[in-house]
């Protein structure tokens, strides 16, 4: 019975999903994040501006507004 529990634990460990592995990599999302920006649904926070789109146009790419 202990072998069965150990086998079950090993199988769960081997077949667990890695975080983010199911997310498709959209080219616009990769371009946004490589520039140090982030993706957000809806409007960007107050000190950020929309600099493009992410996830095939479903989200906004938010960039920090440069200090003056």
Swiss-Prot record:
GO cellular component, one term: extracellular space
GO molecular function term, any single one: CCR6 chemokine receptor binding
Pro-peptide positions on chain: 20-25
Domain of life: Eukaryota
Subcellular localization, as worded in the UniProt entry: Secreted; Cytoplasmic granule
Keyword set, alphabetical order: Antibiotic, Antimicrobial, Defensin, Disulfide bond, Secreted, Signal
GO process terms (BP): defense response to fungus; defense response to Gram-negative bacterium; defense response to Gram-positive bacterium; innate immune response in mucosa
The keyword Cell membrane is annotated on this UniProt entry: no
Range of residues in the leader sequence: 1-19
Induction: Expression in the theca and granulosa layers of the F3 stage ovarian follicle is not affected by intravenous injection of LPS.
Tissue-level expression: Strong expression in the testis, liver, gall bladder and kidney. Also expressed in the ovary and male and female reproductive tracts. Expressed in the ovarian stroma and the theca and granulosa layers of the ovarian follicle.
Pfam family, one: Defensin_beta
Record field: transmembrane: none
InterPro entries in the record: Defensin_beta-like
Disulfide-bonded cysteines: 32-61, 39-54, 44-62
Similarity comment text for this entry: Belongs to the beta-defensin family.
Record function comment: Has bactericidal activity.
The protein's name: Gallinacin-10
Lineage of the organism: Eukaryota, Metazoa, Chordata, Craniata, Vertebrata
């Amino acid at each position: 019975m202990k072998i069965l529990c150990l086998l079950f634990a090993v199988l769960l460990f081997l077949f667990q999903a890695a975080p983010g592995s199911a997310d498709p990599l959209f080219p616009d999302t990769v371009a946004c994040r490589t520039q140090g920006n982030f993706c957000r649904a809806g409007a960007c926070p107050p000190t950020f501006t929309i600099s493009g789109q992410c996830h095939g146009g479903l989200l906004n790419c938010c960039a920090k507004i440069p200090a003056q």
